[in-house]
Amino acid sequence: MDKYNLIIGSHVSLKAKDFFYGSVKEALSYGSNTFMVYTGAPQNTKRQPIKSFKIEEAHNLLKKHNINLDDLIVHAPYIINPCSSKKNVRELAKEFLIQEIQRTESMGITKLVLHPGSRLEQNEDIALEQVYTMLNDIFSTINTNVIVCLETMAGKGSEIGVNIKQLKTIIDNVHSKKNIGVCLDTCHMNDSGLILDYYNFNQYLKEFDAQIGINYIKVLHINDSKNPCGANKDRHENLGYGTIGFANLINIIYHPLLNNIPKILETPWFNVNDELIPLYKHEIKMIRDCKWYDIKNKLLSKK
């Protein structure tokens, strides 16, 4: 592990008045060397002008702390559904995704995580075709270095992007290979039915490499799960408090095939004295030390 380049961080906020500059400061307070942001609220399309983001100040602070822009992540909003059964919804999704790609590029970031969407009453093949058709339309419309990273999903409702076969179908049919990648989410993988112990995760990576190519994995979301394997529910838990377990997550984080790939925490905030606080700083320290401790009990005992 001494030679392992651990790139670890969390989701951080991007809000007035410091915007991107404030995101960097928040990430540094957690001991991170990467982070992920939404460019606005994930539930809507309302966005502030990119000129207000304090990009130059953010870049200067990143450079001061030797954080590589290529290791940072933007997450597209949840409302983008590339495989909606309604054409007007797909058109809105395409136009807004183009704008998100352009915002991501303006920030100097090269990775944009996208939920592949929910097919609703459509069959799987049609839904998958709609996703790769939209991506092909986008990449033929704009020239960009941004990589759209399809997130592995939990299988809640009619979600797609749940398994390697679905991801392979999309990636095989996207013409601009430089613009497509995958984000592995450990909670979603568990909830979709994948056992994430050492042996089974190795088998998953072997299959992924054979079917798609390990080089397409661009980012990981590191979360424990509140649910049993195969629950198809998607409820994140703090590291070591869920059904995946800290030891299994450490094996994933430090897997030799995943060296130099950013790992992002999206774990829940914790209620202490009626105040919700992030545990990212503590979780990142545990990851760096490869040692778990009961931070929740420790914080509650200070009441």
Curated annotation (Swiss-Prot):
One of its GO terms (biological process) is base-excision repair. Binds 3 Zn(2+) ions. Zn(2+) 2 binds at residues 151, 185, 221, 266. GO terms for molecular function: deoxyribonuclease IV (phage-T4-induced) activity; DNA binding; DNA-(apurinic or apyrimidinic site) endonuclease activity; phosphoric diester hydrolase activity; zinc ion binding. Its EC number is 3.1.21.2. Belongs to the AP endonuclease 2 family. PANTHER family: APURINIC-APYRIMIDINIC ENDONUCLEASE (PTHR21445:SF0), ENDONUCLEASE IV ENDODEOXYRIBONUCLEASE IV (PTHR21445). This is Probable endonuclease 4.
